[in-house]
């Protein structure tokens, strides 16, 4: 059994190409490029060990405010006299507001909002982070590290990379669709959930993780699974978040990330899987964090995580694959496995509490919402053109162009 620390419990011809053959090759090439781009974007790496021992304010209220603000805007996008009869249409509008093809809106917001505390934060910290983080030791042509590293934030008492918010709203929708497909095929809700998680494990083991960066992130899978329940809660449960009243759709209860975040989103608690090549680069850096295991903040946090951890379907299914020999045991990639020192957080742990109370960094939800709205209105949106040229021996050149939509403060 695997515990929570380790988890879980082409052609060679010459000449011109014409007609249908050219079209076929073009379509295949474009599809391949899109898959790789999406894979690289999904392979944004994060390092929670870097934040160990560093103070970080809980940003639950700010993140909740953003999620609820976008839901309000999704509802408002429909004319008052032409409200959709189907709740799922509102959910689709919400999903479109939260995600994008590569870097998702909610993640970019978390990177930049003054109301979200994060590590690293500021140019100097970011430079240090790129130089010393868990994935800093990599070859120049390591495409898996070309995308930006994601900072750590804290929500519901759990530290995780901002990429998990993107997984929640993006891959969570994919899981939701797979779940509904299973139900339509006559599967039980339990089997439909397993169908969705199984697809996610397969994708993360291939283009979205292992092939793109040499990392199979189980915390990403946990965020994906939570995202499925996030979308189910909008319309498909007995007490949905969205309800239809006389004046149209309204939020019956606010979105609360406390319902979805678990300690298994923290990659220092639930380690990913690595390919041999990636592990050779990661392990020496991981060993430099061993002395932080005894840091009082780290000891308290890891004890608290174990109290909060109630297991998960993702953990169960990963453990099944480990037992079948289909994937590696994540325990071998944990900090406990590489450090000679014992983990102090396992010694003399206090009695598990019946309920973990989370004290947020902000007390007045309405005030936080107002601040998030004001910040959003003070930003201007614009597009940047990006161009690149790559030359390799012998005499092979490739070029790329792209447009990045971004924002910056107006004042």
Regions found by a protein language model. Give the residues of each.
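Bacterial N-terminal signal peptides that target proteins for export
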Residues: 17-30
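Active-site glycine-rich loop that binds ribose-phosphate moieties when present
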Residues: 201-204
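Serine residues within intrinsically disordered or low-complexity segments
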Residues: 10, 14, 29, 398-400, ...
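Generic short amphipathic/hydrophobic targeting helices enriched at N-termini
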Residues: 3-4, 13, 23-24, 34, ...
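Compositionally biased, intrinsically disordered low-complexity segments enriched in Pro/Arg/Gln/His
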Residues: 5, 9, 18-20
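Intrinsically disordered, low-complexity, mixed-charge
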Residues: 42-198, 208-221, 225-386, 393-407
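Bacterial N-terminal signal peptides
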Residues: 29-37
